[in-house]
Amino acid sequence: TYAAGPLTAQAYYHQFKRAVGTDAVSDKQMGLGAGYNFGMFRIAGSYNVADPDGANNKHTGYNLGVGVKLGAGELLGQVIQQKVSTGGTDPKATTFGIAYTQPLSKRTNVYATYGQTRNNSTGAFSLRASDITIAPVVAGDDPKAFSVGLRHMF
């Protein structure tokens, strides 16, 4: 992790073995991310790859997010693209999210969010809304979620 003033950057690489039956397989994960805070707005992006052992299962993802200050609150937006390389018709999805958060005090805020994952015909990527995962019923479904809430940090 690197942080200097308004600039942040991160990189990671993991390689680990997991036991499957009697054979140990090796999985790899890697990613890069960066962000910049311009004061009234901020932008961040990342690129991630997960390559589990075996053929035709490499997962890649791109993420771009923005935050814009609106008075004391903040409007947030995010776009994520995901793909699994299967050697056939690759499952793909684009997820869009928008949120607004408004502080009520130093430790309490209210928020509203909307998100949608758009899967291609073979995609079955889920949508995560807060701590809930909304999975598509069948490949090609497009899960959606809207939430409002009050958050207090202890």
Could you say what each language-model-derived stretch is?
Residues 141-154:
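Outer-membrane beta-barrel "beta-signal"
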